[in-house]
Amino acid sequence: MTRTTHFGFKTVSETEKAREVAGVFDSVAERYNLMNDLMSGGMHRLWKRFAIEVSGVRTGERVLDIAGGTADLSSLFLEQVGSRGEVWLTDINNSMLTIGRDRLLDEGTAVPVAQCDAEKLPFPTNYFDCVSVAFGLRNMTHKDVALKEMLRVLRPGGCVIVLEFSRIWKPLQRLYDLYSFKVLPAMGGLVAKDRDSYRYLAESIRVHPSQEELKQMMQKAGFERVQYFNLAANAVALHRGYKF
């Protein structure tokens, strides 16, 4: 029997979701950073800096950036760990990974990169001090499996940080829906020449677990001291959990 999952509001086979998500990011990769700036008014850069602060990463530590895409977090983590540290930039999508790698090279920095599935990480157990995923978890087919893999590669005492869109403050829901389903696709069509991918973005946010649901998923995966920080009227949440 074919196993199904969500691709936005559609129910599709797991194989089809992987193919569809790959198509989305192949399409938007070249305009990804520009669209992020336009969609969030540049706020995504502040959210990512906050994620770095909350991670507590220090000089000399090892960091795994999952779904690292255009390397926003990897670039910031590099500033924290310094020359004695190690930052791995990973993504399942080659188009996104190539842009991130080339960006870091243009900045004069070379980091190890790996195209890999977050559900099957090619790293040893108990290796990293911090694992991060920003705006990538909702695209994963088996979020529970990916979270368990993140736990596996963390060393005891290490933390995971998950930055993701979440459930907005209810009084703003109608305005947010108007923005998500009318403005975003129009903006995507104008700037990235792809309305459908940004329609998927809006839909994928709506079917992603709430703040409390994701907290429970992380706890079930084995993370401890899980907490979250609501940002931008709850439209975005940063979750943090530890491995002990």
Swiss-Prot record:
Keywords: Menaquinone biosynthesis, Methyltransferase, S-adenosyl-L-methionine, Transferase, Ubiquinone biosynthesis. InterPro entries: SAM-dependent_MTases_sf (IPR029063), UbiE/COQ5_MeTrFase (IPR004033), UbiE/COQ5_MeTrFase_CS (IPR023576). One of its GO terms (molecular function) is demethylmenaquinone methyltransferase activity. PANTHER family: 2-METHOXY-6-POLYPRENYL-1,4-BENZOQUINOL METHYLASE, MITOCHONDRIAL (PTHR43591:SF24), METHYLTRANSFERASE (PTHR43591). The keyword Phosphoprotein does not apply. Methyltransferase required for the conversion of demethylmenaquinol (DMKH2) to menaquinol (MKH2) and the conversion of 2-polyprenyl-6-methoxy-1,4-benzoquinol (DDMQH2) to 2-polyprenyl-3-methyl-6-methoxy-1,4-benzoquinol (DMQH2). Belongs to the class I-like SAM-binding methyltransferase superfamily. MenG/UbiE family. The keyword Transmembrane helix does not apply. S-adenosyl-L-methionine binds at residues 70, 91, 117-118. It catalyses: a 2-demethylmenaquinol + S-adenosyl-L-methionine = a menaquinol + S-adenosyl-L-homocysteine + H(+); a 2-methoxy-6-(all-trans-polyprenyl)benzene-1,4-diol + S-adenosyl-L-methionine = a 5-methoxy-2-methyl-3-(all-trans-polyprenyl)benzene-1,4-diol + S-adenosyl-L-homocysteine + H(+). GO terms for biological process: aerobic respiration; menaquinone biosynthetic process; methylation. The gene is ubiE. The lineage of its organism: Bacteria, Pseudomonadati, Pseudomonadota, Betaproteobacteria, Nitrosomonadales. This is Ubiquinone/menaquinone biosynthesis C-methyltransferase UbiE. Pfam families: Ubie_methyltran (PF01209). Its EC number is 2.1.1.163, 2.1.1.201. Coiled coil: none annotated. PROSITE patterns: SAM_MT_UBIE, UBIE_1, UBIE_2. It comes from Nitrosospira multiformis (strain ATCC 25196 / NCIMB 11849 / C 71). Pathway: Quinol/quinone metabolism; menaquinone biosynthesis; menaquinol from 1,4-dihydroxy-2-naphthoate: step 2/2; Cofactor biosynthesis; ubiquinone biosynthesis.
